[in-house]
C-alpha cells in the first residue's frame, strides 16, 4: 500500500517581512505570509477576475536564516515544502492552523533579484537554498519555476557525516571520443 505524497509547490509574493526567531537549541524558525494570485475572465460579465490566496509558511534551520536575511515584503519566492496542521490550546479552546513547512527536505528559491530600495540593488540573481543532500542536476529546467536570466547559486546544507581517514575515491573525467567523423550531422529536428 502506498504511503502517500505530501508536497506543496508555491510561487508567490511575500506579504510582509519574514518573522525570524530562534529555538532554545539555536535553530532558526522563520514565518512568512505568501500570496499567490490567479486570474480568469468571468464568462457572464466578460470581466477579468483575480483571486489572491494567502499561505502561512514556516521554515526551519539554515533555510530559515537565509529567508530572514534576504526575503522582504514584495519579494518573489519559489517554495517547496509539505502541508502540516498544528494544534494548540489557548484559553481552554483548541485551535488549529494549516501551514506549508519548509524543513530539511524543502527548498526555497529567491526569484527576481533583490526588491526595490535595497542598498545592494543591481546584483540581481537568486539562490536556491536547499537543506537536503544535493540532487542530480536535470538536463532541462523545471517547468514549475519561472526562468531567470541572472545566475543562480545553490547553497546546500548536508547532514553531518562521520569523518573517514581514507581519502575519497577519485572519479576520472570522461574521455572524449577519438573519432569525431562518426557523429551524424543530420539531426532529425
UniProtKB/Swiss-Prot annotation:
Domain named SSB: residues: 5-109
Chain ranges passing through the membrane: none
Motif window: Important for interaction with partner proteins: 184-189
Gene3D superfamilies: Nucleic acid-binding proteins
Coiled coil: none
This protein's GO CC annotations: nucleoid
Chain positions covered by the region annotation Disordered: 110-189
Comp. bias regions, Low complexity: 112-121, 130-179
GO MF term list: single-stranded DNA binding
Alphabetical keyword list: DNA damage, DNA recombination, DNA repair, DNA replication, DNA-binding
GO biological process: DNA recombination; DNA repair; DNA replication
Top-level division of the source organism's lineage: Bacteria
PROSITE patterns, alphabetized: SSB
Record text on subunit structure and interactions: Homotetramer.
Function: Plays an important role in DNA replication, recombination and repair. Binds to ssDNA and to an array of partner proteins to recruit them to their sites of action during DNA metabolism.
Entry protein name: Single-stranded DNA-binding protein
Organism: Pseudomonas syringae pv. tomato (strain ATCC BAA-871 / DC3000)
Amino acid at each position: 500500500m502506498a504511503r502517500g505524497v505530501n508536497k506543496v509547490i508555491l510561487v508567490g509574493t511575500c506579504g510582509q517581512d519574514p518573522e525570524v526567531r530562534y529555538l532554545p537549541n539555536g535553530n532558526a524558525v522563520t514565518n512568512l505570509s505568501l500570496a499567490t494570485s490567479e486570474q480568469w475572465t468571468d464568462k457572464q460579465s466578460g470581466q477579468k477576475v483575480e483571486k489572491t490566496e494567502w499561505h502561512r509558511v514556516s521554515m526551519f534551520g539554515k533555510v530559515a536564516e537565509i529567508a530572514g536575511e534576504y526575503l522582504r515584503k514584495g519579494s518573489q519566492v519559489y517554495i517547496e515544502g509539505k502541508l502540516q496542521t498544528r494544534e494548540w490550546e489557548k484559553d481552554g479552546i483548541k485551535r488549529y492552523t494549516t501551514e506549508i513547512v519548509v524543513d530539511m527536505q524543502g527548498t526555497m528559491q529567491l526569484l527576481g533579484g533583490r526588491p526595490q530600495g535595497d542598498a545592494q540593488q543591481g546584483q540581481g540573481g537568486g539562490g536556491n537554498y536547499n537543506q537536503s543532500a544535493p540532487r542530480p542536476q536535470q538536463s532541462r529546467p523545471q517547468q514549475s519555476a519561472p526562468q531567470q536570466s541572472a545566475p543562480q547559486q545553490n547553497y546546500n546544507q548536508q547532514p553531518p557525516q562521520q569523518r573517514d581517514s581514507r581519502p575519497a575515491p577519485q572519479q576520472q573525467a570522461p574521455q572524449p571520443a577519438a573519432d569525431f567523423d562518426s557523429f551524424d550531422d543530420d539531426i532529425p529536428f
